[in-house]
């Protein structure tokens, strides 16, 4: 099915990940190690001699990474702002999603196919939502980050003004959306309703006002959670 992930964070704070300063880079590496570290496995190899090979050592230590697991090389390339090849982008997005759970004011993941996303906008239009405030408009802007979408993935960004206006307009029409189709819209609306509070906190903490980074991931991308809603909040 895939999943729609909403991240409340200023776009400049997202861009700061790529080519991070020393303080942020230290945090990113620590979060990556805590989430993606794997134990060292001990493999016993037979002792045999060959005219072409040296004597094999009986115990060789190596890290066995699960398929699709990000590597230390991926971490360093992202932190240093280096180019990421397309065949590495899916696992690098696993890293970025993990970092966003720590850096964002809040985040949520909503199980949703592309077809369902488009259907929701049709439902909302029928309920009277102006097209200016459709869900698709929350993905209108290009985040302009070095890490491009993995195959099948879609990303977009919306600024604070668009977010708050969409929240107001959604609040006015949600009651006329059929109850059977209201779950995903309610999840989006609940998330957007937190923005006024986050904006006040941002001023108090000297951080930029949060925007909205939207990531739609197909079910082939790891860390999409199609089985249920997930959400979290931070204010660090």
Describe each region flagged by the PLM:
Residues 1-208, 217-236:
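Acidic (Asp/Glu-rich) sequence patches and key acidic residues
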């Amino acid at each position: 099915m895939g999943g729609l992930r909403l991240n409340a964070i200023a776009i400049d704070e997202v861009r700061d990940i790529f080519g991070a300063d020393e303080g942020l880079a230290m945090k990113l590496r620590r979060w990556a190690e805590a989430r993606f570290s794997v134990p060292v496995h001990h493999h016993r190899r037979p002792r045999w001699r060959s005219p072409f090979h040296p004597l094999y050592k009986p115990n060789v230590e190596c890290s066995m990474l699960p398929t699709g697991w990000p590597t230390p090389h991926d971490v360093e390339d992202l932190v240093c702002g280096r180019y990421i090849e397309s065949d590495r982008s899916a696992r690098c997005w696993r890293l970025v999603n993990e970092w966003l759970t720590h850096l964002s004011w809040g985040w949520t993941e909503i199980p949703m196919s592309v077809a369902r996303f488009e259907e929701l906008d049709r439902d909302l239009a029928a309920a009277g939502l102006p097209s200016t405030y459709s869900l698709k408009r929350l993905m209108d802007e290009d985040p302009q980050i070095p890490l491009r979408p993995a195959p099948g993935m879609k990303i977009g960004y919306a600024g604070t003004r668009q977010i708050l206006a969409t929240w107001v307009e959604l609040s006015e029409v949600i009651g006329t959306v059929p109850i059977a189709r209201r779950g995903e819209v309610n999840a989006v609306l609940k998330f957007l309703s937190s923005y006024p509070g986050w904006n006040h906190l941002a001023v108090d903490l000297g951080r930029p006002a949060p925007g909205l980074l939207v990531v739609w991931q197909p079910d082939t991308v790891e860390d999409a959670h199609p089985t249920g809603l997930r959400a979290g909040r931070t204010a660090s």
